[in-house]
Structure formats: C-alpha cells, structure tokens
From Swiss-Prot:
SUPFAM superfamilies: NAD(P)-binding Rossmann-fold domains (SSF51735). NADP(+) binds at Y150. This is Putative dihydroflavonol 4-reductase. It is an enzyme of class 1 (oxidoreductase). It comes from Synechocystis sp. (strain ATCC 27184 / PCC 6803 / Kazusa).
C-alpha cells in the first residue's frame, strides 16, 4: 500500500469514497469546517473530484487488512465508499466491496482506535412502502423484496455496521435518499436524467417518484451525525438524509423552468422499457458489456421511492435546502464541466 505524508493533528477524519459524488461534497464540507481529511482512494480511481484540495491520500482498497495503520491519528471515520451497479452480473463484486469491504473497514477502525464512525448506508437498504407512502427509519422491507443485487448488498452492509455497533463500536448509520447538486462526476442515475434532459434525449419517460436532497445537505448531515447522532444498537437506529418527495414529472417541470427547455409530455408504459432492458441484457451479458438500461433500474421506476426524513431534521438539524436550487446548481455544474454543450 502506498501512503503519502500527512500532518498529525486533532480532528482528523479518515474518509472512504471521497472521489464519489457524496464523498467529494463531504470532503469539501469537512475542509470548510476546519478538519484535516485523509482520503482512501483506489489505485484505479481518477480523483478529479478532489484535485487541488489540501487533503492527504492513502492509495488502497476497502479490503486491505492493514488500513488500521493508515487510520492512526484520525479521530473519526466516514465510510462512504460503495460499489454501485444495477446489473445483476456484478453481484459478486457488489458483495465483495459493499459487504466484505464494510466488515474490513470497521474492523480496521476498531483496531486503529477510531472514536466514532459514520457509515453511509442508503434508503436502498430500507426499501419502499409503495402506494405513495413514506417510509421512515423504523420501516424495513424484507431483504428478498429489495430489487436487485445493489440494494441487497447495501442491506447486508448495513447489518455489518449494526453488528459491529452492537459489539461495542460507536457507529452512526445514515441513509441518504437521492442527492442532487455539483460534483456528480460519474454521473449518478439522477444526474443522467438531468443530462438526458439537457441533451434533448428524453422524448418520453416512465413517471416515478423520488426523494431528493441537495448533496451538500447530505454532506452536512454526515458531520452532524458524527457530532449528534445516536449509536446504532437496534434496527431503526439510523437517519434518513432526505428532503422532498417529488415525481419525475415534477423534476422535469423544474428543469424546464430552470433551463427554458420544454419538458417531455409523453409517458410510456412500463412494459416497453422492461422489454428493451430484457433484450439488451440478454444480448450484452455474453459480451461482457453493461446494458444502457439495466432491468433492475426499470423495475425500481415502477415504485414511488418516498421517505420521511423528519427524524434527521429534528435530531441532527439536517438542512433542507431548496430542491429547485440544487437542480439548478447541478445543471450549471454539468454545463460548466463540459457534460453538455451550452447554446
């Protein structure tokens, strides 16, 4: 493992997943609050999201057994990293990174004497109630009903965090909903929706429902969880980091207002993208190529993924910034970073 030199100081946080969407915003928030950041990055990662930031780098993998050595001197851990894929072919990679990686990171944190860990789970691990009902932290869909290997891996990873906490580690679990805003470099599926809208590649859509939150509020929520959150000891000891429940139609209407571009008016029945996804996966799987429309993603769109974040607002002081402004900031970030041609 390769390690660069870091400055020993108090209030140092070890962050995994710092090159990702949530992680990059979290790193910036921690720096703004005056904390030292030590970030774990994979050798294959492109740390474009963290360029020119005054942080210390540790090059390694979530499953490296000697990470405790690199955590020495840090007060806290934010375990944000996760492998994200909606393609069933990646099931083993999802389990290895999300579940076994979480188990190893937490074991290393304990060995390093980390005082408190915030584990970034997801509302994906909670599941949905359906029929437009909002799920809160006390709700749990049976794991077999969670759609796809990614959601199931996040469920089992959260169980790793809960087990470690029950065995004595101080761990706070947060479950972000659907973040939007700047630094969506990959981009996320929601970022892809924004880009398809901007590129005029969305003649029609399958209407669904999401819980959106400004990604910078998610970042702030992580630090607030470290400062004020309750240690996870029983199921439900977690914090949904979310804000506004909104239909995809509503999101597209906001984007139309922000950009002046017309929103698509036509919806398509679910069977159409399901058929396309099924055919695409059957053709591409033998070739080792990822489908453009994963079957699990289409199945998820059949559900309104609505959540109640009032617990995090009341107990942590989770900010609730304007969703329309977060969408506008995402649009401007994509435009300013070459993702879409500006007129």
């Amino acid at each position: 493992m390769e390690v660069n030199h870091w400055i020993a100081m108090a209030d140092c946080f070890f962050v995994t997943g710092g090159t990702g969407f949530v992680g990059a915003n979290l790193v910036r928030h921690l720096l703004e609050q005056g904390y030292q950041v030590r970030a774990l990055v994979r050798a294959s990662s492109r740390p474009d999201n963290l360029q020119n930031l005054p942080i210390d780098w540790v090059v390694g993998d979530l499953n490296d057994g000697d990470l405790h050595q690199q955590m020495q001197g840090c007060q806290g851990l934010f375990h944000v990293a996760a492998h994200y894929s909606l393609w069933q072919k990646d099931r083993e990679a999802l389990y290895r990174s999300n579940v076994l990686g979480t188990r190893n990171i937490l074991a290393c944190a304990q060995k390093a004497g980390i005082e408190r860990t915030v584990y970034t789970s997801s509302v994906a691990a909670i599941g949905v109630k359906g029929d437009g009902q909002r799920a809160d932290e006390s709700y749990q869909s049976p794991v077999e009903k969670l759609i796809g290997a990614y959601k199931q891996s996040k469920y089992w990873a959260e169980q790793e965090a809960l087990t470690a906490a029950q065995q004595g580690q101080d761990i706070v679990i947060v479950n972000p909903s659907t973040p939007i805003g700047p630094w969506d470099i990959k981009p996320t599926p929601t970022g892809e929706i924004i880009l398809r809208f901007l590129r005029r590649q969305m003649p029609a859509y399958v209407n669904t429902g999401l819980n959106l939150i400004d990604v910078r509020d998610v970042a702030a929520g992580h630090l607030l969880a470290w400062q004020r959150g309750k240690t996870a000891l029983t199921r439900g000891d977690r914090y949904i980091l979310g804000h506004e429940n909104i239909s995809l139609q509503g999101i597209l209407a906001h984007l139309s207002t922000i950009t002046g571009l017309p929103a698509p008016k036509n919806t398509v029945p679910l069977w159409l993208p399901l058929t396309f996804a099924w055919v695409e996966e059957k053709v591409l799987a033998p070739l080792g190529r990822s489908p453009s429309v994963p079957m699990d993603g289409v199945k998820m769109s059949a559900q309104e993924m609505y959540y109640d974040a009032s617990k995090a607002v009341q107990e942590l002081g989770l900010p609730q910034s304007s969703i329309k402004q977060a969408l506008a900031d995402a649009v401007h970030w994509f435009q300013n970073h070459g993702y879409v041609k500006t007129q």
